[in-house]
């Protein structure tokens, strides 16, 4: 909304002296690039949970990135960031991010079983899948509950969303798994188009091919007028999945 409103302004307020801090679901790379190039605002991303009080990592542009192409700089800023002071980040064998720090909770109030599931050998299990690169930067691949399992392969909905959103005709996108007799789950893209723009399913799939492995490309794409969101604008994927999973036991993915 801010980016769209700024298009009608002759001068963007705070250009060159404003910082925008983003937390929650990782934003699309194209959005990060637009914030920095069109608004002139510094983009900072942080990651954490209520149980970690809340900061675990932070990603702020570094001086050595200043010479980079805006798209490459945005790609680096799309990572969740490096561990904050006093925080250690790790990974389980299954690829779930774990954290250890003084500010991590001791446990859930009067819920010993939930506490035992969440904290193992002193490490808090975040419920987020991810990676840690050679620089120590954390990248969130997906919430465990949002990972799509298609033909035995794990598909990150965030990765597919980023590929679809990079098409200029796409205004909003959500990617979910829906039941399929052959593959278990199919990758479904729900897309809201920019007003006045048009694009076909095949054109969007072709756009994704250089960016995604073949099994990650959405088998189906549906166009919507809007997507279910919370009051703060976060996608409600459980609501988007509901109608597709009626009559099936598994409704998480």
Predicted regions and their residues:
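Hydrophobic/anchoring residues in structured secondary elements
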Residues: 22, 175, 222-223
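Acidic/polar alpha-helix N-cap and adjacent early helical turns
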Residues: 242-253
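AMP-binding/adenylate-forming catalytic core of the ANL superfamily
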Residues: 101, 106-107, 117, 129-216, ...
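Short, conserved loop/helix-junction motifs that constitute active-site signature segments
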Residues: 9-16
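Conserved AMP-binding/adenylate-forming
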Residues: 18-23, 27-46, 50-138, 143-147, ...
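Residue-level signal for well-ordered alpha-helical positions
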Residues: 5-6, 111, 151
């Amino acid at each position: 909304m801010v980016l769209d409103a700024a298009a009608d302004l002759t001068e963007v307020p705070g250009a060159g002296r404003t910082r925008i801090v983003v937390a929650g679901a990782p934003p699309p790379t194209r959005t990060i690039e637009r914030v920095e190039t069109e608004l002139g605002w510094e983009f900072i991303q942080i990651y954490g949970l209520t149980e970690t009080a809340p900061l675990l990592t932070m990603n702020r542009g570094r001086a050595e990135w200043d010479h980079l192409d805006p798209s490459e700089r945005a790609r680096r800023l799309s990572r969740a960031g490096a561990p904050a002071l006093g925080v250690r980040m790790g990974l389980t064998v299954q690829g779930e991010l774990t954290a250890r720090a003084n500010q991590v909770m001791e446990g859930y109030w009067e819920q010993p079983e939930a506490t035992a599931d969440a904290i193992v050998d002193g490490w808090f299990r975040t419920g987020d899948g991810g990676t840690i690169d050679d620089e120590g930067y954390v990248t969130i691949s997906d919430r465990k509950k949002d990972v799509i399992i298609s033909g035995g392969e794990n598909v990150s909905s965030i990765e597919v969303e980023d590929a679809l959103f990079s098409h200029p005709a796409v205004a909003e996108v959500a990617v979910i798994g829906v039941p399929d007799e052959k593959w278990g789950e199919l990758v479904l893209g729900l897309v809201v188009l920019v007003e006045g723009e048009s694009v076909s399913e095949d054109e969007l799939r072709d756009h994704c091919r250089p960016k995604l492995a073949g099994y990650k490309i959405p088998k189906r794409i549906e166009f919507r007028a809007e997507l279910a969101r919370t009051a703060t604008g976060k996608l409600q994927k459980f609501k988007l999945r509901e109608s597709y999973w009626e009559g099936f036991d598994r409704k998480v993915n």
